[in-house]
């Protein structure tokens, strides 16, 4: 049996925080605001995986009202989600992700992001695709106010 999941997330850019996307720290004058490390891409991947196994979303599993998850490492959260996927008997077929950001340019960081996601999902890097786009200076991402991400995952029953 195949299961498809979709994830979407948005975080506001703010000064005084590191910019971590896809488990990769990107040099930039702003970072993403959030209760955890605010890794918009890994949150999207986690939500897609949870959706595919009908387990809600990351807000249900890691509520921002719980101090345990303050400044949490999203890579570890994704590993926890992947353990749930495996418990339900699924394995990764592939995942396709898109980052929407006007700045900074993501191209130099795409391959390391793919590698981190593959590591968390215990998959081959060829099963992971990450791409980035601008929004042609339109909307909150185009104005540099935040970064958005979406992902679609395909899982297969072992």
From Swiss-Prot:
Residues involved in a divalent metal cation binding: 9, 11, 43
Metal-binding in keyword set: yes
Source organism superkingdom: Bacteria
Gene3D superfamilies found in the cross-reference section: 2-C-methyl-D-erythritol 2,4-cyclodiphosphate synthase
Keywords: Isoprene biosynthesis, Lyase, Metal-binding
Biological process per Gene Ontology, one example term: terpenoid biosynthetic process
Residues that coordinate or bind 4-CDP-2-C-methyl-D-erythritol 2-phosphate: 9-11, 35-36, 57-59, 62-66, 101-107, 133-136, 140, 143
Cofactor: how bound: Binds 1 divalent metal cation per subunit.
InterPro entries registered for this protein in UniProt: MECDP_synthase, MECDP_synthase_CS, MECDP_synthase_sf
An example molecular function term from Gene Ontology annotations: metal ion binding
Record site feature (Transition state stabilizer), residues: 35, 134
Biochemical pathway: Isoprenoid biosynthesis; isopentenyl diphosphate biosynthesis via DXP pathway; isopentenyl diphosphate from 1-deoxy-D-xylulose 5-phosphate: step 4/6
Cofactor names: a divalent metal cation
Coiled-coil stretches: none
Subunit organization: Homotrimer.
PANTHER family per the UniProt record, alphabetical: 2-C-METHYL-D-ERYTHRITOL 2,4-CYCLODIPHOSPHATE SYNTHASE, CHLOROPLASTIC
NCBIfam families: ispF (TIGR00151)
Role played: Involved in the biosynthesis of isopentenyl diphosphate (IPP) and dimethylallyl diphosphate (DMAPP), two major building blocks of isoprenoid compounds. Catalyzes the conversion of 4-diphosphocytidyl-2-C-methyl-D-erythritol 2-phosphate (CDP-ME2P) to 2-C-methyl-D-erythritol 2,4-cyclodiphosphate (ME-CPP) with a corresponding release of cytidine 5-monophosphate (CMP).
Family: Belongs to the IspF family.
Name of the protein this chain belongs to: 2-C-methyl-D-erythritol 2,4-cyclodiphosphate synthase
Species, as recorded: Bacillus pumilus (strain SAFR-032)
Organism ancestry: Bacteria, Bacillati, Bacillota, Bacilli, Bacillales
């Amino acid at each position: 049996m195949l299961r498809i999941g979709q994830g979407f997330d948005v975080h506001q850019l703010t000064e005084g925080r590191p910019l971590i996307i896809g488990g990769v720290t990107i040099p930039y004058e702003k970072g993403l605001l959030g209760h955890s490390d605010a890794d918009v891409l890994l949150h999207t991947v986690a939500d897609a995986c949870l959706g595919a196994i009908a387990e809600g979303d990351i807000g249900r599993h890691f509520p921002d009202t719980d101090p345990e998850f303050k400044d949490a490492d999203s890579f570890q959260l994704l590993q926890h989600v992947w353990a749930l996927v495996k418990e339900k008997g699924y394995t990764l077929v592939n995942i396709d992700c898109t980052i929407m950001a006007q700045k900074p340019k993501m191209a130099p960081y795409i391959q390391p992001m793919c590698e981190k996601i593959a590591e968390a999902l215990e998959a081959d890097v060829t099963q992971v695709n990450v791409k980035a786009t601008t929004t042609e200076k339109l909307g909150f991402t185009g104005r540099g106010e935040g970064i958005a991400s979406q992902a679609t995952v395909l899982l297969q029953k072992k």
